[in-house]
């Protein structure tokens, strides 16, 4: 079964700064069962773990992964993890997640029900993955999110991904507004070339404590986009806000020790309380910006898991 072999092509941002390699150069293991999947992603041996078929469980099932892994879905639809939640552990680091589809049942909706949960380790790249979501309503009681990156996880990039059809989107940083200085600076996270469609709040995310560089993303059908909470340091560049922007919910600024700067987004993302950022992304890595029009076109055509080939911004 064919699968993406682009390896480190397209690596960008803080993940590139950390020299993430995943399982590059290691053995290739194709898995077709949950038991084989659990075994292949564990430990520290350099491994490219290929989903040879989609995997589904009837109940929420947590799979802990180790380090030095590339976890990649095959083309042709053999790349779906349903009700399977990937979790870091204290020894996790240097992992690539690519061309995966994360699905979950509507009934799995508690606060900590999050399909990709990164709370330990340095160096992760989440690329060309999809979270298709499900139907939801304002009064359905759901508290689950799509992805969490926080605590001491660090040097991470989310690129070319699709997040859609969910009440809550993404949550980043130590998940409390308790001014806990132990978590200041975590995570360093790049969020670029992603497509957020019909996410009510937290797309691109609720941000706390870390350094967040967010550029060339398209957010459509939303109520609140950025939620800037405790001690977040956010740089937004040339993002596009579609339906929902007329309600001026681009930045939910809590004014709680954070900084926020927007450069050229359409329409502008304006923080009402937080002062300008005091750091620059370019001091950490090099990158190129698309125009907002080009960024919107790019993500609509190329973001998310793919059936035949992965494309990357030039």
UniProtKB/Swiss-Prot annotation:
Its EC number is 4.2.2.10. The active site is at 202. It comes from the Bacteria. One of its GO terms (molecular function) is pectin lyase activity. Induction: By DNA-damaging agents such as nalidixic acid, mitomycin C or UV light. SMART domains: Amb_all. It catalyses: Eliminative cleavage of (1->4)-alpha-D-galacturonan methyl ester to give oligosaccharides with 4-deoxy-6-O-methyl-alpha-D-galact-4-enuronosyl groups at their non-reducing ends. In most stains, pnl production is accompanied by cell lysis and production of a bacteriocin. This is Pectin lyase. It comes from Pectobacterium carotovorum (Erwinia carotovora). The gene is pnl.
